[in-house]
């Protein structure tokens, strides 16, 4: 079938199961070939082909609402709703988004990127439907990994209590990104092996209705037998107790089973949970055999071998550098423990976990719990390292503030993927952490200029005993600089001058140091002397150096790959105001007050005006123009 010609999913209504099987094979081949060039979330999407097709055949999108939790598994949905011709632009600048996008299609009714939000969104839509008196079906599709998120459980509790008509699709592939952990995962494992509970329950009810009633005694006995068999057949009937009608488990790759259960769910009043078993990566052997999450999301790859197409790294990844430095220090200090909310692979903690399994905690998709658990460990004189992506740290704001900072506990937070991350887009850009971390009392916040300084910052954080400390570091690899053999500690709140200058000064840190140095060198050719300062401590500021700069009265330019509102530049302005030095000329460069879309980091920096060219132009505007000499002077 020509998948690029699909306009909407109505063509599915008249197709037989055999034709749908052929369509599924075509879709899988399309995804494998397309993502081999662009990269993307191949594993999750190969696993939901039949489920997505079945949903669009049985229901009527966009009238009926599909809410894809996390959203990385929505490629098949995009294909069936007329966006196949755009797949060659997937996750590229101004191209097809890798997640549902409301302004991209009327079929995308809920935008996602972070996990565990679909059930709460669905509850809101169901409540609105009932208030308006309409009759659409609401169908959140949530994975077994996302179901471990606290927000999802809060929503289950409310939905079950309100008894709203809703069909929750539990896409159970036994993985989120990495293999799932926790008691809910264990419970779902029991359900997978328990058989079809709903069929047994219906048969029992039919049987009991045929037994002649002898007073109320037999009826009561029959009900007790039914309840006992329920718990015998399905250990831990969590969803039924929450108020849901539980259906399944169902083979998520069998159209016959999917159609039977989806039609049953349509006729059932109140909230229904359909438990669907799928195979992540189905149809492509390298992805299907993946046990640790390597094929969850990838770059380009060779179809025949499954080898990834990427240049040999000249330097270690930032995640690897940080985790391996922590691991090295853990050999000398048994109090060091590592915590990750479901990202052991992305955070490169596999080596730590293998060497120190009793000191490694993957808590699942539970950022709030991870932060407060770190606080608990710190109260017992342990040294917790919380490895967390910047975008997911947003979800633990209150726990960092209330449980870690307020108690002034020695927790080291490694803020991975800080700054622009590129193709994953606006839900994943790590640009807000400075603004929400720097106002927290007791918090130290820093970012290194390169991987050598990075390893020393990790050591500084581990040795720091005066409260919480956080280190930001970007996605990708280091710069390939020479690494010191001996680890050092860096004085808290100390900056360093990287390039001398007397006409103006740039205050910056991390990834934007390179463009600052390049701009300073360009202006040097024009006879302008610009100082570049590595403001590696975002909090506390180096007040001694700042005071010296203010005494010189020269213009100041701050640069940050983070939001300007409440950011590093704001802290410098606040300091200057408090010092009654408002006559100093100050300009700030950074991320504007908007969400930054997907695309390459270079393209995004160009779009927002954060390049060496714009830095140089800004400095030229700030510096006084030398007076022209007259003729004969």
Curated annotation (Swiss-Prot):
The free-text note explaining how the cofactor binds reads: Binds 1 Mg(2+) ion per subunit.
Q: Which cofactor does it need?
A: Mg(2+); thiamine diphosphate
Where thiamine diphosphate binds, per the record, is at: 72, 113-115, 145-146, 173, 284, 367
Keyword Magnesium annotated = yes
EC number, as in UniProt: 2.2.1.7
| Cellular-component GO terms for this entry | cytosol
Catalyzed reactions? D-glyceraldehyde 3-phosphate + pyruvate + H(+) = 1-deoxy-D-xylulose 5-phosphate + CO2
Name the pathway it acts in. Metabolic intermediate biosynthesis; 1-deoxy-D-xylulose 5-phosphate biosynthesis; 1-deoxy-D-xylulose 5-phosphate from D-glyceraldehyde 3-phosphate and pyruvate: step 1/1
One Pfam family here? Transket_pyr
Gene3D superfamilies, sorted: 3.40.50.920, 3.40.50.970
Supply the CDD domains for this chain: TPP_DXS, TPP_PYR_DXS_TK_like
Q: Name one GO biological process term.
A: 1-deoxy-D-xylulose 5-phosphate biosynthetic process
PANTHER family referenced in this protein's UniProt entry, alphabetically: 1-D-DEOXYXYLULOSE 5-PHOSPHATE SYNTHASE-RELATED, 1-DEOXY-D-XYLULOSE-5-PHOSPHATE SYNTHASE, CHLOROPLASTIC
Q: What does this protein do?
A: Catalyzes the acyloin condensation reaction between C atoms 2 and 3 of pyruvate and glyceraldehyde 3-phosphate to yield 1-deoxy-D-xylulose-5-phosphate (DXP).
Task: Give the protein family.
Answer: Belongs to the transketolase family. DXPS subfamily.
Describe the subunit structure: Homodimer.
Protein name as catalogued: 1-deoxy-D-xylulose-5-phosphate synthase
Q: Which organism is it from?
A: Bacillus pumilus (strain SAFR-032)
Q: Which gene encodes it?
A: dxs
């Amino acid at each position: 079938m020509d998948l690029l010609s699909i306009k909407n999913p109505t063509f599915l209504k008249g197709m037989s199961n055999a034709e749908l099987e052929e369509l599924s094979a075509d879709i899988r081949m399309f995804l494998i070939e397309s993502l081999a060039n662009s990269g993307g979330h191949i594993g999750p999407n190969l696993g939901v082909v039949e489920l997505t097709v079945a949903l669009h055949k049985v229901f009527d999108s966009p009238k009926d609402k599909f809410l894809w939790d996390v959203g990385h598994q929505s490629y098949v949905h995009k294909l069936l709703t007329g966006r196949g011709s755009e797949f060659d632009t997937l996750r590229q600048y101004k191209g097809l988004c890798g997640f549902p996008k409301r302004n991209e299609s009327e079929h995308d009714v809920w935008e996602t990127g972070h996990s565990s939000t679909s059930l709460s969104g669905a509850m809101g839509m169901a409540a609105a439907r009932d208030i308006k008196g309409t009759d659409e079906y609401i169908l959140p599709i949530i994975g077994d990994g996302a179901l471990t998120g606290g927000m999802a459980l809060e929503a289950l509790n409310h939905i079950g209590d309100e008894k709203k008509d809703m069909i929750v699709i539990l896409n159970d592939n036994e993985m989120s990104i990495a293999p799932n952990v926790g008691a809910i995962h264990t419970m779902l494992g029991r359900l997978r092996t328990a058989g079809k509970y709903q069929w047994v329950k219906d048969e029992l009810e039919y049987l009991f209705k045929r037994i002649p009633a002898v007073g109320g005694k037999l009826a009561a006995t029959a009900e007790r037998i039914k309840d006992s068999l329920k718990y015998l057949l399905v250990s831990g009937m969590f969803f039924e107790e929450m108020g849901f009608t539980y259906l399944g488990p169902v083979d998520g790759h069998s159209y016959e089973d999917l159609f039977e259960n989806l039609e049953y769910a349509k006729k059932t009043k109140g909230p229904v949970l359909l438990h669907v078993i799928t195979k992540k990566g189905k149809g492509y052997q390298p992805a299907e055999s993946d046990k640790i999450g390597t094929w969850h999301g990838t770059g380009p790859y060779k179809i025949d071998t499954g080898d990834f197409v990427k240049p040999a790294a000249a330097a270690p990844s930032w995640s690897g550098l940080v985790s391996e430095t922590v691991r090295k220090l853990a050999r000398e200090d048994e109090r060091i423990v590592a915590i990750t909310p479901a990202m052991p692979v992305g955070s490169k903690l596999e080596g730590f976990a293998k060497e120190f399994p009793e000191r490694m905690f993957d808590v699942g998709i539970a950022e709030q719990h991870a932060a407060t658990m770190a606080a608990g460990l710190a109260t017992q004189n342990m040294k917790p390292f919380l490895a967390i992506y910047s975008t997911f740290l947003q979800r633990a704001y209150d726990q960092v503030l209330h449980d870690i900072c307020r108690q002034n506990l020695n927790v080291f937070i490694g803020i991975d993927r800080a700054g622009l991350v590129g193709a994953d887009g606006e839900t994943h850009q790590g640009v807000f952490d400075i603004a929400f971390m720097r106002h927290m009392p007791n918090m130290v916040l820093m970012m290194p200029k390169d991987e050598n300084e990075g390893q020393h910052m990790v050591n500084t954080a581990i040795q720091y005993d005066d409260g919480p400390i956080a280190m930001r570091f970007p996605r990708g690899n280091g710069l390939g600089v020479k690494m010191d053999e001996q680890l050092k500690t860096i004085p808290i709140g100390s900056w360093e001058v990287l390039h001398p200058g007397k006409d103006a000064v740039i205050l910056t840190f991390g990834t934007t140091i390179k463009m600052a140095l390049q701009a300073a060198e360009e202006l040097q050719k024009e006879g302008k002397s610009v100082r570049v300062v590595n403001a590696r401590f975002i909090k506390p500021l180096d007040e001694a150096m700042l005071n010296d700069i203010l005494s010189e009265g020269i213009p100041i330019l701050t640069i940050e790959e983070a939001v300007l509102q409440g950011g590093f530049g704001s802290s410098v302005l606040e300091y200057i105001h408090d010092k009654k030095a408002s006559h100093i000329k100050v300009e700030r460069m950074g991320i504007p007050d908007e969400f930054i879309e997907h695309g390459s980091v270079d393209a995004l920096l160009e779009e927002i005006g954060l390049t060496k060219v714009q830095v140089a132009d800004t400095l030229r505007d700030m510096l006084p123009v030398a007076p022209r000499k007259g003729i004969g002077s």
